[in-house]
Swiss-Prot record:
Alphabetical UniProt keywords: Carbohydrate metabolism, Chitin degradation, Disulfide bond, Glycosidase, Hydrolase, Polysaccharide degradation
SMART domains: CHB_HEX
Protein name, per record: Beta-hexosaminidase
Domain of life of the organism encoding this protein: Bacteria
The organism of origin for this protein: Vibrio vulnificus
GO MF, one example: polysaccharide binding
Signal sequence annotation: none
EC number(s) stated in the UniProt entry for this protein: 3.2.1.52
Any GO BP: chitin catabolic process
Cross-referenced PANTHER family: BETA-HEXOSAMINIDASE, BETA-N-ACETYLHEXOSAMINIDASE
GO cellular component, one term: membrane
InterPro entries referenced in this protein's UniProt entry, alphabetically: Beta_hexosaminidase_sua/sub, CBM2/CBM3_carb-bd_dom_sf, CBM2_carb-bd_dom_sf, CHB/HEX_N_dom, CHB_C_dom, Glyco_hydro_20_cat, Glycoside_hydrolase_SF, Hex-like_dom2
């Protein structure tokens, strides 16, 4: 750029520019011909110079867009894609200046569509050449859980009109409104607090409720030599959080009695007038028995029901995945996350610590991984940080920056162990590895400058002579580790060794290591290092398509030599040569994430039949970065499904994936079909997953995960009577939302809905007050309501949650269903927690 710009010009622009955006339309009539499937959307950007000086023409504005630009419609402004979601606005030779007090507007096209306000990424920033970047002040997000409020400083968001709410003409899904929610939630009966007081989540195998109750006003005292001290401490913390004293009061006798006929984690719990007795078949069972005792507690009550429970887990693996790479989240959040996992008997924590956007774990001997790879700021050379992504902005600190020290990680391991949770670390490779690649390139440059070629090349992950051109699914062009270089395996061996040491020091020996294994289509083809392998018969690699299989096989031997089991996403294991028996070591684990409508239905059984231990992780049911409902005011991506509400999570039958098609549609609401194939092996378990691209704060994590996580815990622990058994050769077709399909599930739908009513009543009356006591910012239900005959009628998704209404948007009143208020025109309604936190308010209009 020209030399007539300095840091003062950048600072002035960031301070005095007011940048706002608005959606013009999804799929305008003149989409550029290069738009994939002819789909694009158009955004208007307004630049207002609120200062007195003219804007320097050499100032550049950077911003994040998860969809790649198709170009500007303006003659004065150019918009170009940089890498990932990072884009840049520059002026053209036709730019006529932007004087103080003036505004310029222009329109930009992007690929695909936009129907959630979380697609509007914050922290536009100003920069030029190697000057320091500065965030444009009005685009800095407001600290809020609700997305529309968070981005309200710079975007008007998506309007409730067809050309903005609908992605294409084939989008059949109705928008969520107060009326549609009313119609849905009115079908769920309010059972009342007394009816669910003796019931817990996840649902036990057998529960007998007896007459009478046990007073625990003085507290409970866990008496056990069977449980280690750290687990007793964790359990006491659970009770104290719920307001129950520990170390005094009613004795809780906990013992272990081995029984080989029962599953690990099985237990019995007896609450009688004389005391409490828990017998586990092992330490896990004893621990879960005490958690079930906590489940009997109703916040604010001094008594629990007298019951007898005989219980065992349905599936061995009951997990949650948390991505801290896209946006970093605090150690304290991880602790709270583990607390809630333990409360609902989840036992596997899939900890996603490295991806394109960040490396989050300190690795001894490789400081660049956290010095560079753990931070995002404006550094074109990427010697001190990664370039901004996902609206992280130019300035430090930000939500895209941070990492766990070695001591932090060991604390997390100890905290998880005390809650009977295994931590499964995941560093994504060879794809999704930009942070690692750029960190090692920075290391390379540092040692080359010192003249130490051996050190420089020791851990290098990229071939500097590779001219391959590709785009990853997130629009990166350089995010893939090169498996044709020996230094890549030296790096991975080093990382795995260091993580292995951390687990030993943290008291939880490493057994499973998740390598991600995502493949970047189109990578490596023009790498000279790879071309050497293509002509070497002993390599077994004939072309670029064989490289990922070679990589997986080689990593399996590295892990096996260390006594570790390989885990990976199923797409990375899809190479034709990669049956489980072809890989070294124990049967590998495959986390299968096929969607219902992209042919993913068949992948679950297919990988199990190949000998993999399958963890069921369907995006269109168990991905919690998807919105709760079809409303632009709900945060989340929607590439797999337009919404995953709690009932949908609850209803998903994990052991017969094709059968779910009968009550589901594709992401546009169209009919889908699936046929059950051969299934020779049972699945290992289930996992909910949180990817954090749109989730910047700890509170937003809790909002997106809970209460949906409890529904995954329910399906992982308890097999419901209404779940369809797997039978080969049965075809299922959508029979919902106006589609006439198969009716295999008809007899079970009413039973499922009654079970949902029971589950949701327990959530509202018992579990949400417990989450309040724990300080969890879970999603309060958005209400359904209508005004009929001048009477306001309001319903909630979870009975037991308090409701408020307002006639002026300022004064709020408690809603009493027995004395429904008179309203002539409109009202606002919202839910409110037991500790005074309020849910998203919605407007209700009289018909």
């Amino acid at each position: 750029m020209a030399s007539d710009i300095d840091q003062k010009d950048v600072d002035y622009a960031a301070k005095n520019l007011k940048l706002t955006t608005s959606l013009v339309a999804n799929k305008p009539k003149d989409c550029p011909p290069e738009a994939p499937w002819g789909a694009c959307y158009r955004v208007e950007i307004n630049l207002e110079n609120t200062g007195s000086k003219s804007l320097n023409e050499n100032v550049e504005i950077y911003f994040s867009s998860i969809h790649r630009t198709l170009g500007s419609k303006s003659e004065e402004f150019k918009v170009e894609h940089i890498n990932g979601d990072l884009h840049k606005i520059t002026t053209t030779e036709k730019f006529k200046g932007l004087k103080g007090g003036k505004t310029k507007s222009f329109q930009v096209d992007f690929m695909n569509w936009i129907v959630s306000n979380s697609d509007f990424m914050p922290n536009y920033y100003v920069a030029s050449e190697h000057l320091e970047g500065r965030n444009i002040l009005n685009t800095v997000p407001i600290d809020a859980v609700h997305i529309t409020e968070e981005v309200s400083g710079f975007t008007t968001g998506i309007k409730h009109t067809p050309n903005q709410l609908k992605r294409t003409a084939n989008d059949l899904l109705p928008a969520a409104t107060a009326t549609t929610r009313y119609e849905q939630y009115s079908k769920v009966k309010d059972l009342g607090a007394d009816a669910v007081s003796a019931h817990i989540l996840p649902t036990p195998l057998e529960t007998s409720v007896h007459e009478g109750s046990l007073n625990i006003a003085q507290g409970i005292n866990i008496v056990s030599d069977a449980l280690p001290a750290d687990q007793v401490e964790a359990l006491n913390f659970r009770f104290e959080t719920l307001g129950v004293n520990t170390g005094t009061g009613v004795p809780v006798n906990v013992t272990i009695k081995a029984d080989s006929s029962k599953k690990s984690g099985s237990y019995t719990l007896d609450v009688t007038s004389s005391g409490i007795r828990i017998v586990g078949v092992d330490k896990a069972g004893a621990f879960y028995g005490v958690q079930s005792l906590a489940g009997l507690v109703t916040v604010g009550k001094d008594t629990i029901n007298q019951v007898s429970i005989n219980d065992e887990p349905r599936l061995d693996y009951r997990g949650m995945h948390m991505d801290v790479s896209r946006n970093f989240h605090s150690k304290e959040l991880v602790f709270r996350f583990l607390d809630q996992m333990a409360a609902y008997k989840m036992n596997k924590f899939h900890f996603h610590l490295a991806d394109d956007e960040g490396w989050r774990l300190e690795i001894n001997g490789l400081p660049e991984l956290t010095q560079v790879g753990a931070h995002r700021c404006h550094d074109v050379e990427q010697n001190k940080c990664m370039m901004p992504q996902l609206g992280s902005g130019a300035e430090l600190p930000n939500n895209g920056s941070g990492y766990y020290t070695r001591e932090d990680y060991k604390e997390i391991l100890a905290y998880a162990s005390a809650r009977n949770i295994q931590v499964i670390p995941s560093m994504d490779m060879p794809g999704h590895s930009l942070a690692a690649v750029k960190s090692m390139e920075a290391r390379y440059r540092k040692f080359m400058a010192e003249g130490d070629v051996v050190k420089a090349e020791m851990y290098l992950l990229s071939d500097p002579n590779d001219t391959t051109q590709y785009y990853s699914i997130q629009h990166y062009q350089d995010n893939t580790i090169n498996p044709c270089m020996e230094s890549s395996f030296v790096f991975m061996d080093k990382v795995i060794d260091e993580i292995n040491k951390l687990h030993k020091e943290g008291g939880q020996p490493l057994t499973d290591y998740h390598i991600g294994a995502d493949e970047t289509a189109g990578a490596w083809g023009d790498s000279p290092e790879c071309r050497k392998m293509f002509v070497a018969p002993e390599s077994g690699v004939k072309n670029a398509k064989d490289i990922n299989g070679y990589f997986i096989n080689r990593i399996s031997h590295i892990l096996d030599a260390k006594g570790l089991t390989l885990g990976a996403w199923n797409d990375g294991l899809s190479h034709k040569a990669l049956d489980a028996s072809s890989l070294a070591g124990n049967p590998p684990k495959a986390w299968v994430w096929g969607t219902m409508f992209w042919g993913g239905v068949d992948q679950y059984n297919s990988f199990a039949n190949k000998g993999y231990d399958v963890v069921v992780t369907p995006p269109d049911a168990y991905y919690f970065d998807m919105p709760y409902e079809n409303d632009p005011e709900e945060r989340g991506y929607y590439w797999a499904t337009r919404f995953n509400d709690t009932k949908k999570v609850f209803s998903f039958m994990p052991e017969n994936v094709p059968a779910n098609v009968e009550w589901m549609t594709d992401r546009m609401g169209a009919k889908i079909s699936a046929t059950t194939g051969e299934k020779t092996h049972d699945f290992l378990g289930v996992q909910g997953a949180l990817w954090s691209e749109t989730i910047r704060t700890d509170a937003q994590v809790e909002y997106m995960v809970l209460p949906r996580m409890i529904a995954v815990a329910e399906r992982g622990w308890h097999k419901a009577s209404w779940e369809e058994e797997h039978k080969e050769g049965i075809t299922y077709t959508s029979n919902v939302d106006g589609h006439e399909g198969t009716t295999h599930l008809n007899d079970n739908i009413a039973t499922r809905d009654a079970d949902w009513a029971h589950f949701s009543n327990i959530l509202g009356y018992k579990e949400m007050p417990k989450l309040d006591k724990a300080g969890i910012t879970y999603r309060l239900p958005v209400l359904g309501a209508v005004i009929k005959n001048n009477i306001l009628d309001v319903v909630t998704e979870f009975h037991g949650v308090a409701i408020q209404y307002s006639l002026d948007g300022k004064t709020w009143h408690k809603y009493d269903d027995t004395k429904k208020p008179q309203v002539s025109t409109k009202a606002l309604v919202r839910s409110v927690s037991t500790n005074g936190r309020t849910g998203r308010a919605v407007e209700v209009l009289a018909k």
